[in-house]
A protein has these predicted regions:
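Interhelical loop/hinge segments that connect adjacent transmembrane helices in multipass membrane
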Residues: 1-5, 181-185, 197-241, 280, ...
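Signature of the first transmembrane helix
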Residues: 4-68, 93, 97-103, 132, ...
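Membrane-interface junctions at transmembrane-helix termini in multi-pass inner-membrane proteins
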Residues: 6, 133-161, 182, 343-374, ...
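Transmembrane helical elements of multi-pass membrane transporters/channels
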Residues: 7-23, 162, 187-203, 217-286, ...
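Helix-loop junctions and terminal segments of transmembrane helices
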Residues: 57-73, 148, 208, 263, ...
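Interfacial segments at transmembrane-helix termini and the short loops linking adjacent helices
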Residues: 107-128, 316-353
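Hydrophobic alpha-helical transmembrane segments
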Residues: 156-205, 374-379, 392-413, 453-457
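Membrane-proximal transmembrane or re-entrant/amphipathic helices at the cytosolic face
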Residues: 439-486
Length: 486
C-alpha cells in the first residue's frame, strides 16, 4: 500500500489505542472516589446519551464522503457542505436535548432502579445531560470534515486531548469538590464542550473556513439521502451485536450471558487495527476513482490478513490462559471455547468491513443497509437454532456464520475480483482453524507456545508467498540491513 496510507493507519491506530489505556488508568480512581453505585449510575447516563447518537442520521459519514470528493475543487463547495451538515446536526441535536430531558426524567424516576439520593443527583444534572447531545452531534460533523480532508494527525491529537479532558476533569471535580453526580456530570459535559471547541478549531484550520455560511437545502437533502442508508446499516449492526446476548439470556439464563459476554467484550478489542484501517480508507475510497479504489481494496485486504492473522493466532492460544489468570478456572473453562470461535468472527468481520466501506464510498450505500436488514432475521433464526442445539458454542458459530454471509454479500456488491481475495482469505483461515483446534485440545502452555510460534511463522511465510508487495518490502529491508552488517 501507499506510504501515506500506512502512515495514516499507524496514526489512527495510535489514536484508538491511547484512550483505552487512559480509561484503564482512571476507572479504579472513579470507582474508589464515587463508589460502585454512583459509578454505575453515571455509566447508565452515558449509555442513555449514547442512544441519541442515532440523531446524527449518518450525516457525519456523509460529510466525510462529500468533502473527500470535493477536496480538489476550489469552488467553495467544501465550506457549503460543512455548514449545511453543521446546522443540520445542530438542529437534530437540539431536538435530542429536549427529548433526553424528558426521557431521562422518565427513565430515572420510573424505570431504572436507582437509590433516591442518586435520583436527585441525576435530576439536578438533567440540563447538563441535555446539553451533551448537541455537543456530541456537532462534534461528529467536525470529525467527519477532518476525516474527509485526511488530516488524521490533527484529528487524533484533538481526540486524545479530548479523552484526557473527559477522563481527568470530572476526576478532579470528584476529589476537589464533591463525588456527587450533580458535580461530576457537569464537569464531564464541560470537558466534552472544551474538546468540541478544540476539534472545531482544528476543523476550521483544516478546511480553511473564514466565515459562517447559510445551510443549503439541496445539500442538506443530498447529505441526508446518503446518510440515511448509513444510519439504517448502523441500526442493523447495533441490533445484531446485542441480539446474541439477549437470546442467550432468554434461553440459557444470566449466568450464561456472563460466560459469553466476557470473552466477547475481550475479543472485540482486537478490532483496533481494522478500525484504524476503515478510518483511513473511507475518505481515500471516496476521493479515488473506481479502478484505483478497487486496487486499494485488494491491497488493504492483503495487508490486513498479513498483519492481523498472526495477532489472531496469538489470541486463540492466549485466551484461555488469560481468562484463567484474570477471572479464574471456571470462567476460562466455560468461556474460552466460545471465545475462540468469536475471535474468528472478529477476524472475518474486519475484512467484510473494508468491502462495506468501499461500497458505501463508491457504489451505493443502500446495498450495505439492505444486506444488514435482510441478514438480520436469518441471523436470529440461526442463532436460536444454534443455542438450542449447542448452547453457547452454537451462538458463537451463528455469529461466525453471519460474518461469512456479510463477507460473501459485500464481496459480490463491491465488484472486486473474487478469486485472489477468497484464496488469500481461505489460506489464512486454514491457519486459524488449526490454531483453534490445537488450543481446544492442548493443556500444556509450552506446547501451545511452540505450536503458536510455528503457526505465526508459517502464516507470515504464506503472506510472503502471496503478496508481491510484502516481498518488495522484505527486499528493501534486506538491501538496507546487509550493507550495514558488512
Amino acid at each position: 500500500m501507499e506510504k501515506s496510507l500506512l502512515k495514516n493507519i499507524a496514526i489512527n491506530f495510535a489514536g484508538l489505542i491511547l484512550p483505552v489505556f487512559v480509561s484503564l488508568a482512571t476507572v479504579p480512581a472513579y470507582i474508589h472516589g464515587m463508589g460502585i453505585e454512583r459509578y454505575g449510575v453515571i455509566n447508565l447516563v452515558w449509555a442513555l446519551i449514547g442512544y441519541f447518537s442515532v440523531l446524527d442520521l449518518g450525516i457525519s459519514m456523509a460529510t466525510e464522503n462529500h468533502i473527500a470528493k470535493a477536496r480538489d475543487a476550489n469552488d467553495g463547495s467544501i465550506q457549503r457542505i460543512f455548514w449545511s451538515a453543521f446546522f443540520l446536526n445542530l438542529a437534530t441535536g437540539i431536538a435530542g436535548a429536549v427529548m433526553i430531558w424528558f426521557g431521562a426524567y422518565i427513565y430515572v424516576v420510573h424505570i431504572a432502579t436507582i437509590a433516591p439520593a442518586f435520583q436527585r443527583e441525576v435530576l439536578q444534572s438533567l440540563p447538563w445531560i441535555a446539553v451533551a447531545v448537541p455537543i456530541a452531534n456537532v462534534s461528529w460533523v467536525f470529525s467527519g470534515a477532518i476525516g474527509g480532508m485526511e488530516k488524521f494527525t490533527l484529528y487524533n491529537t484533538n481526540q486524545t486531548v479530548g479523552t484526557f479532558l473527559f477522563q481527568l476533569l470530572p476526576l478532579a471535580a470528584l476529589y476537589l469538590i464533591s463525588p456527587s453526580l450533580a458535580v461530576v456530570v457537569p464537569a464531564a459535559v464541560i470537558a466534552r464542550f472544551l474538546a468540541a471547541l478544540l476539534l472545531g478549531y482544528g476543523t476550521f484550520r483544516a478546511l480553511g473556513i473564514t466565515g459562517i455560511a447559510k445551510p443549503e437545502w439541496p445539500l442538506i437533502r443530498e447529505l441526508f439521502n446518503y446518510g440515511r442508508w448509513l444510519l439504517l446499516f448502523s441500526g442493523a449492526n447495533m441490533i445484531a451485536t446485542t441480539l446474541d446476548r439477549v437470546v442467550i439470556g432468554s434461553m440459557l439464563g444470566a449466568k450464561s450471558v456472563a460466560y459469553y459476554a466476557t470473552p466477547q467484550n475481550l475479543v472485540t478489542r482486537l478490532n483496533l487495527l481494522p478500525s484504524a484501517m476503515l478510518r483511513t480508507l473511507f475518505p481515500r475510497f471516496s476521493a479515488s476513482g473506481s479502478e484505483h479504489a478497487g486496487a486499494l481494496s485488494h491491497q488493504a485486504l492483503a495487508f490486513l490478513n498479513c498483519a492481523f492473522t498472526p495477532c489472531v493466532v496469538v489470541a486463540l492460544f492466549g485466551l484461555a490462559p488469560f481468562l484463567n489468570v484474570w477471572l479464574g478456572h471456571e470462567m476460562a473453562v466455560q468461556s474460552a471455547p466460545v471465545g475462540r470461535v468469536l475471535v474468528i468472527g472478529v477476524w472475518l468481520a474486519g475484512q467484510s468491513s473494508i468491502m462495506s466501506v468501499l461500497i458505501q464510498a463508491k457504489a451505493n450505500p443502500a446495498q450495505v443497509a439492505r444486506v444488514g436488514w435482510i441478514g438480520l432475521p436469518v441471523f436470529a433464526l440461526v442463532l436460536w437454532l444454534g443455542i438450542r442445539w449447542y448452547g453457547l458454542l452454537g451462538a458463537g458459530v451463528a455469529v461466525v456464520a453471519k460474518t461469512f454471509f456479510d463477507y460473501a454479500a459485500f464481496l459480490y456488491f463491491s465488484k472486486l475480483k473474487p478469486q485472489p481475495i477468497v484464496r488469500n482469505m481461505a489460506g489464512h483461515l486454514l491457519f486459524l482453524i488449526v490454531a483453534t483446534l490445537c488450543a481446544d485440545y492442548m493443556d500444556s502452555l509450552s506446547s501451545m507456545a511452540a505450536i503458536g510460534v510455528a503457526l505465526v511463522v508459517g502464516n507470515l511465510g504464506w503472506s510472503y508467498c502471496e503478496s508481491s508487495e510484502l516481498r518488495e518490502v522484505v527486499a528493501r529491508l534486506r538491501q538496507r540491513l546487509l550493507p550495514s552488517a558488512g
